[in-house]
Every structure is written in structure tokens, then in C-alpha cells.
Regions:
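C-terminal "capping" alpha-helix adjacent to the active site of nucleotide-linked donor transferases
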Residues: 254-272
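Short, hydrophobic/aromatic alpha-helical segments in well-folded domains
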Residues: 224, 262, 280-281
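Nucleotide-sugar donor-binding catalytic core of glycosyltransferases
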Residues: 2-46, 51-67, 74-249, 292-294
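A charged, aromatic-enriched C-terminal amphipathic alpha-helix characteristic of glycosyltransferases
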Residues: 268-300
């Protein structure tokens, strides 16, 4: 059984995202092993899912070289202000190593963002865009024939260095204060995997809110996009350009007023209409946007 080392993410969205990759590799017959630093990896005959800022020394670069194949998640070299002023948004790999990595034939560079149209990633060379997906191995649709909630939201403040998400979430969820909708909002509650699975499955509508940079640049989607569509089947999400490219038939909202109007619209529909929409959306996700469907990406 071939080993594949996967960067460990202990918290936040990265935890759930890389658990999805872990389960996908395991389902394909690999032996996935989490690592915290590249110093932990020795020997040969392994594949590797690494992150650019893991590579800080020549020894780290050697671990990349020794891998049969390295799937390297890369950050941009520069980024629009204000976000580009914070180290969270740009690559921390030393330039000399970046130049060496570009010449390694065993390194497959990828990003969640649509990088082909922008200059921020140009020093990396060719990069594959791998949008996030639904983890169909760790999440399972529960019986939703009897809904407990009209609308749900599960997420955190996710401070990316500018603490923008908190005010966005408060504004949007505050719109429901005087509505008659039955709401289930879990923000920074640390609910269990099982609770989240059940909450999304038992809600008519799943709400989605992206970060400010995602709204502005429109290059990538959050994990909640795919969980909401797969488990609830009805997603009300903000307008992000790449969402409309990936899911062209799904409406989006431009502001919090449009958001609540769209939620109320869905909740007013007859059940048979909701069921048709739900079935269409869930089929789209399960066929084209799951971690263990490796045909959706060149990561294989």
C-alpha cells in the first residue's frame, strides 16, 4: 500500500477540507499519513500533499524531490490590497526554492483559486485550479422528509488577518431577527461533525456567506458551498463570480436584503418544487464535485 503524506490542519476549514482529501486517498487504496512538518518524512516510495510555506530549507526541498509525486498547494506571490499586506495571503516560500520547484517534473502545483486569468501566481508557472468539493465519504445525507428548520448556517468568524468575516456574518444573520422563519445558526459553536451533518440535512435552505476577498475577487469558493448543496440541496449564497461559472443555473444574492428575500422565496415554494430543485442540485454535486471523484481534477 503506497503512502501519501498529507499536511495536517488541526482546526478551521482546513481540518474538514483535508479530512476530505484523506478519505478520498484512502478510498483509492493509498495509506494516507498526516504530517506537521516536512522534517518528519524520510525514505522514499511515497506521494505528498504539501503546502508551499512548508518548504523553508534545502532539506525540505529534498523531501519534495524524493516524492514520486508532490501535489503542492501554492499561494500567490502578490495579492490585491488590503489582503496582500498580510502574510496569510501570500506565499512564504523563499524565492530560490520557488525557482527550483518550478523545474521539478514530479511537482504538480495547484490552488483552490482560478489562477489562469491573474498575475498574482505568474512566478509559479502552470497551476491547476482545484475547486473545493463535497466530502461524500465523511458526510452522509440524513432523511430530510421532515424538516426541523427553514434555514441554517454553520460557520466561524475565520479571522484571516483583517477580521472582516465577523461584521459580514452579523449583518446577514441579523436580517432574520424579525422574520418568522425557523432558523438554526451555529457560529463559532464548535458543533460536532455529526451535528453539522444533521443540521444541514434537516434544513430547507442552507445559507452561505463568503469572505470579503472572495466576494471582491471572485476566484474561489468556500467548503460550505458544496456541503450546503449536497446535504440541504437548496443553497442561498452570495454573489461570487466563480460560483456563477461553476453553477450557472443557481441564483445568488448581492446584499443581505436580497439574501432574506431569496430564503423566503424558497421556503414559500410547494414541497414538490423544492424536491425537484433539491434533486437537481444534489445530483450535480454528487456527480461532479466530490473529493473522491478524482476525474474532476488532474490530482490523480
Amino acid at each position: 500500500m503506497k503512502k501519501i503524506y498529507i499536511r495536517n490542519h488541526a482546526a478551521f476549514a482546513g481540518k474538514w477540507i483535508y479530512e476530505g482529501f484523506y478519505a478520498a486517498w484512502k478510498s483509492r487504496g493509498f495509506l494516507p499519513i498526516y504530517y506537521n512538518t516536512l522534517d518528519e518524512i524520510s525514505g522514499d516510495n511515497y506521494d505528498l500533499m504539501a503546502i508551499d510555506h512548508d518548504i523553508q530549507t534545502s532539506a525540505h526541498l529534498e523531501v519534495i524531490r524524493r516524492a514520486d509525486r508532490t501535489y503542492l498547494f501554492v499561494q500567490p506571490i502578490s495579492f490585491p490590497k488590503p489582503w496582500g499586506l498580510h502574510p496569510n495571503f501570500i506565499s512564504q516560500m523563499p524565492q530560490q526554492f520557488r525557482e527550483e520547484v518550478r523545474g521539478l517534473s514530479n511537482v504538480h502545483k495547484w490552488s483552490f483559486a482560478k489562477t489562469q486569468e491573474i498575475e498574482y501566481y505568474s512566478e509559479w508557472g502552470e497551476i491547476e485550479t482545484v475547486h473545493l468539493a463535497y466530502d461524500s465519504l465523511n458526510y452522509k445525507l440524513e432523511d430530510n422528509s421532515c424538516y426541523e428548520y427553514d434555514v441554517c448556517y454553520v460557520g466561524g468568524w475565520a479571522d484571516n488577518g483583517f477580521n472582516e468575516k465577523r461584521s459580514i456574518i452579523l449583518e446577514h444573520l441579523g436580517k432574520f431577527k424579525n422574520s418568522s422563519l425557523k432558523c438554526a445558526f451555529a457560529v463559532n459553536r464548535g458543533i460536532s461533525h455529526e451535528q453539522e451533518n444533521l443540521l444541514l440535512s434537516r434544513s430547507k435552505v442552507a445559507l452561505n456567506i463568503h469572505d470579503a476577498y472572495q466576494r471582491s475577487l471572485g476566484l474561489d469558493l468556500n467548503e460550505r458551498t458544496f456541503k450546503g448543496l449536497a446535504l440541504s440541496g437548496i443553497l442561498v449564497t452570495d454573489s461570487v463570480r466563480v460560483f456563477s461559472e461553476v453553477f450557472p443555473e443557481m441564483p445568488t444574492y448581492q446584499n443581505s436584503s436580497e439574501m432574506i428575500d431569496l430564503v423566503e422565496h424558497y421556503c414559500s415554494l410547494p414541497e414538490h418544487e423544492l424536491a425537484d430543485i433539491r434533486q437537481f442540485n444534489q445530483k450535480e454535486v454528487l456527480e461532479n464535485h466530490i473529493f473522491n471523484n478524482m476525474n474532476r481534477t488532474q490530482i490523480s
